[in-house]
């Protein structure tokens, strides 16, 4: 049974995922285009958000929030970066989203919540991203 604190953690995680999936990434490159200084990259802030949420909260909370996010995007609302529906299941982007499940488990295994410092956060984040990309190669 979920208590109120776990429910709040899940809702905060879900809210963070939905908001960051809609935020585009811009890189200022003033020497390429004279008219506009920003170039939009076709990525979102989902992976850094998943990493940060997994480092802060427990694995179960982030897995539940991410599962709700997937269900919302496939069946209810277009919360993914490029929309969403049942047809999104057949796109490569959905496979990339499914690759975030091992990322959550790997980060939680690497994370030691007794001592928290920036160096461990960065090291565990980069190790988890590398492991996620290696797991996507073998899927």
Place the predicted regions along the sequence by residue:
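Alpha-helical transmembrane segments and their helix-entry boundary regions
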Residues: 62-66, 121
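Short helix-perturbing small/polar motifs within transmembrane alpha-helices
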Residues: 3-23, 85-134
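Membrane-embedded alpha-helical segments of transport systems
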Residues: 71-76, 129-135
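Hydrophobic transmembrane alpha-helices
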Residues: 1-63
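Interfacial aromatic-anchored transmembrane helix boundaries in multi-pass membrane proteins
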Residues: 21-40, 68-103
């Amino acid at each position: 049974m979920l208590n109120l604190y776990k429910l709040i953690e899940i809702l905060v995680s879900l809210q963070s995922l939905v908001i960051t999936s809609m935020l585009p990434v811009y890189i200022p490159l003033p020497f390429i285009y004279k008219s506009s200084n920003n170039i939009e990259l076709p990525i979102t802030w989902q992976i850094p958000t998943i990493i940060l949420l997994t480092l802060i909260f427990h694995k179960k909370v982030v897995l539940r929030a991410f599962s709700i996010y997937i269900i919302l995007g496939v069946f209810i609302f277009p919360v993914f970066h490029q929309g969403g529906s049942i047809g999104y299941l057949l796109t490569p982007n959905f496979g990339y989203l499914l690759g975030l499940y091992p990322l959550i488990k790997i980060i939680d295994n690497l994370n030691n919540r007794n001592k928290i410092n920036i160096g461990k956060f960065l090291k565990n984040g980069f190790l988890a991203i590398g492991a996620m990309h290696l797991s996507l190669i073998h899927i």
